[in-house]
Every structure is written in structure tokens, then in C-alpha cells.
């Protein structure tokens, strides 16, 4: 591990320079990795491992709403009956079981997977949800297996895309149960094999608490909510849809957030007008102080398991997928995002095509 300074706090991280792909391949040479689920993360992680020379088997159902994922696996070169099986058949094989189904799917499939585990196997997660909220999920591994986690800091699409362009994506990793004594090596090897650039140590609990808070907060929920609030305010005061969208979303995604990505928030502020900078610095404090109680409430609901209860209740409902489709359709058909589609079509780079 190397020690790095994060805002004055020293943390130790794993680099792929010290823990190379070759080392990961050696450690995994006698392992057979079974990916249970070929969704967004399952596909990306499985393809990256296959490309890195790891033996991988896919478990994916092929009927109903599962069919597109099975068909995609076949398109990607997985062969039915050879390295592509149903979930139940795949679960019987391998030494490292990657549990990459949805959280609700993990609950449903766990009794089957648990009965296939052999002494010394490893159960691999990319989210601490099922383990930390075991009282609600029922996912309790036996004592004679390793329980490990690698959580990429991005979507499966980014995991695969970054792997293909050679950049990789950072991930956090954790060991919840080390029966064999080699769980640390296993989890690091898996992290590098799926294409991680750096591996950050964490715990299952810290991973799931921060992940659920982030998704409901700045990364998705708060981002969408505050965008809608500003857009609606501008529209209510007579601004056109294009103007409201440009000042709410387009300038952020096409300019400002790229400056933050390059060199930090202060860099972005330094590269804005004086008027923008003075106002933003003043209102930053008001937004921070105004939203902190909301974030505290959110974190409390995550920590107590209330958010988990809601997720499981909604995802198990028979009409869940239809309600989800309706909600996303409503969002996509809102004036704001229909205006956004037109604005995006007018970007110069698209006009050149």
C-alpha cells in the first residue's frame, strides 16, 4: 500500500503498479469466478476479468425481462452450456461467487446460492447492502467461506469503458469474513482484475452507508431535485425553457463541472467572472447550511435501515417495474428534460456530424 494525503488525513491505498494485473492473474489462476447476474456491473466486471485472463462463468436467466441480458451475454461471446448457464446451474460451479444481482434479487436467490457454497469458497459483493442489512435481507453467509467486496466508484458502463481505454476506475474494497486466511489477496486480485486503478480500503458498513447517502443526495436525488427547483423558478419568472435549461443544466455539464473535474472547485471559481464568483461564494454557505439538516436526516434513515425497508418493499411489489417505467417516463417527458433534448441536439459537436 502507498500512503496518500487526503485533505490532511493520511490514508493507505492499493495501486495497480504495486499489485499488478500479472499478480492478480497468478493469485486467481486456480479460481473459477462465477458472475451471478449479467446486468450493468455483472457484464462489465465479467468482461474485464475475461480480458485479463481470469476464468469466468456467467449465471443469467433467459426468459421474461431477463431475456435481453442473456441475449447480450451470447452476443458478448459467452457460450450456453460452456460458460453461460442459468443462475441455479452457475451457482453450483466455481470458487468465487460474484453476487451481482439487484439487492432484491440477491434476497430471492440467496437460499439457492447458500446451499451451493463449499468450504473455502468466497462470496463477492459490489455493495454492502445485503450483508449489512441482513436482518431484512436474510443474506447470512456460513462461517466457512470468505466474504469480500469490491465496489467500483462508477456505473458498470464506466467500468467497461474505462477499462477499454486503459484508464481504469477506482474502487473500494473490504473483507467481512476471512475464513481461508487469503481473503485479502483474493479481494485485491479481484479488484485489479475487474479494472480498478486504485483500491481504497473500507468496510461493508461504511461502503453501504456512504453509497446510499450519495445516491439519494448529491449524485442523483439532490442533483435532480435542485435542478428542477431552479428550472421551475426561472420558468415561473418568465424565462424561456432554453434559457432556464442552459442556466441550470447545460452550463454545468458542459463547462463548469469539467473545470471541477480538472482541478477542483476553487479552480472552477477562479475561472469564472468576478460577479459569478462573489455571488457563488456567498450563496454556497446558505445552501450548505440549509441542506445539512436534510443530509443528516437522510444519513439517519440509511443507518437505521429505514431506507432499506423502503427499497425492498417497493422493489418486491408486483407492479414495481411498471411504476418505475411510469416515473421515468414522467421525468423524461417533463418540459425541462424535453427542452434539454433540444438543447443537446444543438451542441456544436453534434451539428458537425
Residue ranges of model-derived segments:
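Glycine/serine-rich phosphate-binding loop and adjoining beta1-alpha1 elements at the start
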Residues: 1-32, 175, 195-202
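NAD(P)-dependent Rossmann-like dehydrogenase/reductase catalytic/cofactor-binding core
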Residues: 2-6, 11-18, 236-353
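Glycine-rich adenosine-cofactor-binding loop
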Residues: 30-49
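Residues at the starts of beta-strands that form the adenosine-phosphate
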Residues: 32, 54-58, 146
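NAD(P)-binding Rossmann-fold cofactor-contacting core
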Residues: 44, 50-78
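Rossmann-like NAD(P)-binding element
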Residues: 65, 73-132, 140-155
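Rossmann-fold dinucleotide-binding core
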Residues: 124-216
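Active-site-proximal catalytic alpha-helix in oxidoreductases
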Residues: 181-236, 242-260
Amino acid at each position: 500500500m502507498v500512503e496518500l494525503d487526503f485533505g490532511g488525513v493520511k490514508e493507505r491505498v492499493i495501486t495497480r503498479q504495486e499489485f499488478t494485473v500479472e499478480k492478480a492473474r497468478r493469485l486467481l489462476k486456480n479460481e473459477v469466478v462465477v458472475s451471478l447476474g449479467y446486468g450493468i456491473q455483472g457484464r462489465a466486471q465479467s468482461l474485464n476479468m475475461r480480458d485479463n485472463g481470469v476464468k469466468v462463468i456467467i449465471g443469467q436467466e433467459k426468459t421474461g425481462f431477463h431475456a435481453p441480458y442473456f441475449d447480450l451475454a451470447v452476443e458478448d461471446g459467452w457460450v450456453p452450456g460452456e460458460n453461460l448457464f442459468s443462475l441455479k446451474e452457475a451457482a453450483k460451479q466455481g470458487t468465487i461467487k460474484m453476487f451481482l444481482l439487484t439487492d432484491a434479487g440477491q434476497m430471492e436467490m440467496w437460499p439457492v446460492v447458500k446451499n451451493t457454497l463449499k468450504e473455502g469458497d468466497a462470496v463477492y459483493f459490489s455493495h454492502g447492502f445485503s450483508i449489512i442489512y441482513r436482518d431484512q435481507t436474510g443474506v447470512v453467509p456460513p462461517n466457512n467461506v470468505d466474504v469480500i467486496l469490491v465496489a467500483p466508484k462508477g456505473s458498470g458502463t464506466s467500468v467497461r469503458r474505462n477499462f477499454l481505454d486503459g484508464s481504469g476506475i477506482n474502487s473500494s474494497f473490504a473483507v467481512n469474513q476471512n475464513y481461508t486466511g487469503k481473503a485479502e489477496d483474493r479481494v485485491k486480485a479481484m479488484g485489479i482484475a475487474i479494472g480498478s486503478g486504485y483500491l481504497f480500503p473500507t468496510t461493508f458498513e461504511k461502503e453501504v452507508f456512504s453509497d446510499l447517502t450519495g445516491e439519494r443526495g448529491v449524485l442523483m436525488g439532490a442533483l435532480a431535485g435542485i435542478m428542477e427547483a431552479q428550472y421551475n423558478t426561472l420558468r415561473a419568472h418568465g424565462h424561456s425553457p432554453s434559457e432556464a435549461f442552459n442556466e441550470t443544466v447545460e452550463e454545468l455539464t458542459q463547462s463548469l463541472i469539467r473545470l471541477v473535474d480538472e482541478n477542483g472547485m476553487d479552480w472552477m471559481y477562479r475561472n469564472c467572472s468576478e460577479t459569478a464568483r462573489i455571488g457563488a461564494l456567498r450563496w454556497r454557505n446558505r445552501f450548505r447550511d440549509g441542506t445539512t439538516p436534510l443530509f443528516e436526516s437522510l444519513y439517519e434513515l440509511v443507518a437505521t435501515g429505514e431506507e432499506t425497508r423502503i427499497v425492498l418493499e417497493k422493489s418486491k411489489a408486483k407492479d414495481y417495474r411498471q411504476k418505475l417505467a411510469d416515473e421515468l417516463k414522467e421525468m423524461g417527458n417533463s418540459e425541462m428534460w424535453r427542452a434539454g433534448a433540444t438543447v443537446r441536439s444543438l451542441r456544436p459537436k453534434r451539428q458537425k456530424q
